[in-house]
């Protein structure tokens, strides 16, 4: 008989994600799992609130995601639904267009691996309603 361990989000050390003004961003928490400065890889968990959208942003490095719990919804800048990734779905992506993300009917937890990043370019950019960069995350 297998001894299965169930994911328990209460064991995660969640931190608020900082916004451009230094205040926590709405609807998102994060937990850094590993930062490998030699390989330029960041591994972290994000938790997005159910039925909410986080701030508009653009990925500036290659990344991969794995939906751990719930479903990850991504949206185009006009607010229309781009994709739904339920628990168990993996995606590898490259820098791309602005978008926003959020949870489905329950909070979503997503593993992100950002790789490789550089010391001079941002990992991602937070954007305002005019698609202007308001904060770069390095």
Where are these regions (language model features)?
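Conserved short histidine dyad/triad with adjacent acidic residue
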Residues: 39-58, 90-96
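A short, N-terminal "cap"/entry segment at the start of jelly-roll beta-barrel domains
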Residues: 1-40, 126-138
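Conserved catalytic motifs of the protein kinase core domain
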Residues: 41, 63, 107
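Glycine- and acidic-residue-biased ligand/ion/polar-headgroup-sensing regions
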Residues: 50, 59-78
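Short acidic-glycine-tyrosine-enriched beta hairpin
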Residues: 37, 76-103
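Double-stranded beta-helix
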Residues: 102-138
């Amino acid at each position: 008989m297998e001894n299965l361990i169930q994911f328990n989000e209460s064991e995660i050390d969640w931190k608020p994600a900082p916004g451009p003004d230094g205040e926590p961003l709405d609807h998102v928490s994060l937990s850094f799992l590993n930062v490998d400065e030699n390989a330029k890889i960041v591994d972290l968990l994000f938790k997005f609130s159910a039925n909410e959208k986080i701030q508009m942003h653009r990925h500036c490095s290659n990344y991969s995601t794995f939906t751990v719990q719930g479903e990850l919804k991504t949206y185009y800048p006009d607010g229309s639904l781009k994709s739904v990734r339920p628990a168990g779905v993996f995606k590898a992506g490259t820098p791309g267009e602005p978008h926003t993300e959020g949870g489905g009917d329950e909070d979503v937890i997503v593993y992100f691996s950002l790789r490789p990043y550089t010391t001079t370019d941002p990992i991602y950019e937070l954007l305002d309603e005019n698609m202007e960069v308001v904060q770069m995350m390095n």
